[in-house]
Amino acid sequence: MSELSTLSNHLADAVEAAGAWTVRVQARRGPAASGIALAADLILTADHVVDPSREDAIRIGLPDGSEVGGSVVGRDPATDLAILKIASGSLTPARAAQAEPRTGALALVVARPGPKPNASLGLITGVAGPTRTRRGGMLERFIMVDAVMYPGFSGGPLVDAEGSVLGMITSGLGFGGPAVALPWSLVSQIAETIQKHGKVPRGYLGIGSQPVTLSAQAKELAGGQERGLLVVQVAEGGPAATAGLLQGDILVKLDGSAISNADDLQSLLGPNRVGSSVSGSVVRGGELRELSLTVGSRE
């Protein structure tokens, strides 16, 4: 057998292996999408393929060809993840890859938009991040792959040449260009939070802001920091208003960490911050002031 035939058979075996835990998800009008078995009764899929108006009519196509009903455990639109549950508990959970994704490595997108698995082959073109999604989520990392994304592939696994999962593929993050997958380590963390809370709590101060360059005086007050966030709006009754933050203040630090733009602020307002008290350093009227804020939860 030639080396090419050996490689071809190896990749086909990888698709077959991944197909054992890849399911069909019919949760919207139009074509079905795909999902990944997290546990015997839990499925991970892309949030954008689950129509909120059809949550009571979800159908899951299993690898053995049967079909069962599904329900929503929770979802996180910001990272395009949703978790579904089936009653039968008959799924084979996905096998995670032991190695981190490598740029230049072969990878397969496996999907089940119909009764049988489909696949697309490509190269991992890069592992990038952090970046913010169009829905406001912050991704520490994401995987880019040049495989073709056919209809119904969103929610399916990106697997290595052994058929072990590297991440979940999705077209719902709005990046354009190559296909994008969320790394399995990140997906697993978010999935755990969704299972506990039904969503991913995100910190909220209740301000509208824009980045500004600090004046020489403000820069000195901020310890040499060159930029900050000008508060242009304060939500009535929100955490910032309760703490006494005012329109026109310049927020320069949160718990001692410099804030130069909105991404800096959001990175400091993760799920673990919700409900906690933080110290905000603001420049106001030529003075540096410290305010104590209780981080709220963004609904």
Name each model feature, range by range:
Residues 2-3, 22, 27-118, 142-143, ...:
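Conserved active-site neighborhood of the chymotrypsin/trypsin-like protease fold
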Residues 40-44, 166, 240-263:
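Conserved PDZ fold ligand-binding element
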Residues 1-15, 109, 161, 165-226, ...:
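C-terminal cap/linker of serine protease catalytic domains
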Residues 19-21, 82, 86-94, 118-177, ...:
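Active-site region of chymotrypsin-like
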Residues 152-157, 213-222, 235-253, 268:
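PDZ/PDZ-like domain micro-motif
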Residues 32-33, 153-155, 229-231, 246-247, ...:
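Short loop/turn microsegments at loop-to-beta-strand junctions
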Residues 38-39, 160-161, 255, 284:
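A cytosolic small-molecule/anion-sensing beta-strand core signal
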